[in-house]
Every structure is written in C-alpha cells, then in structure tokens.
C-alpha cells in the first residue's frame, strides 16, 4: 500500500489519526486540517495503514505541517513513505527545499528526517505549548524525474 492524496472530505479520518498520534494539547481538529488542505499550495497524503502528512508549497519552498502515524503502526516505514510522497509532490511543483519543525526530544522523528536528507538549520525557542524547543530542519528536494528515495 502506498500513500494516497487527501482531500478535505477526509478531514475527520485525518483528525482521528492525528488525535491518536499526538498529545491532547497538540491535536489538530478536522476543521484545522481542512483549512490547511484547502490553502493555496496545501496538500497531504494518507496511508490506509494509519498515517497522514500535511504540507504546503510556497514558490520554491515546501513545509511539512504535520506528520502523524498511529502508535500501533509505527516502525513499519509509514512515516518514511509519507515523507517521501510529500517530498516528491513538492519537487513536482518546483519546490527546491523542504522545511519542518520537530520537537528536540522527538528522537525517532529526527532520525526519520535525517534519513531522508534533512539537516538542522535552526531552533525555535519555546515553540511548543509545553515550552519545549523546536528544531528547524531543511532538505534539498530532488528535481522531477529523479528519485528522492534513499
């Protein structure tokens, strides 16, 4: 199974995945998810095994807005597959770099991002509601026609 593009019609299902994957103070509602998908340049993917990713492109840059995998579906490559799908989609829209924020203590996510070419380029102090810092990471995107898989 591979990640499939999402539409606002899937917002409730995406919100359920997000709610199961994140702490209550970090959960996005179906309304917020719909708004992000509907933004100019907004897009996302859902994996039927229990994962979702939302991103957006602006001119020649892309940003991962959120990536969530159900706890029972982790360590099966879903996060990697979703991230690769978003990187490919962004590259097809002429984005040449992708950015994201990740909690400094989220070691599993940081390893995933590093495995796909992301490197730390900054820090947002006290970014999260609990006061934790976010690391800003960046990856160069592969031009269309070339494979981003690592």
Positions of PLM-derived features:
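Short secondary-structure junctions
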Residues: 3-5, 119-120
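Acetyl-CoA-dependent GNAT
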Residues: 5-76, 80-93, 140-150
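Short amphipathic helical patch at the helix-1/turn junction of helix-turn-helix
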Residues: 69, 103-104
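Short glycine/proline-centered loop/turn elements that form peptide/ligand docking sites
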Residues: 83, 105-109, 126-131
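Conserved GNAT acetyl-CoA-binding A-motif
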Residues: 90-101, 124
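Conserved catalytic core of the tyrosine transesterase superfamily
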Residues: 97, 103, 133, 138-140, ...
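Conserved catalytic-core motifs of GNAT/GCN5-like acyltransferases
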Residues: 101, 119-135
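Conserved active-site tyrosine of GNAT-family acetyltransferases
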Residues: 113, 118, 137
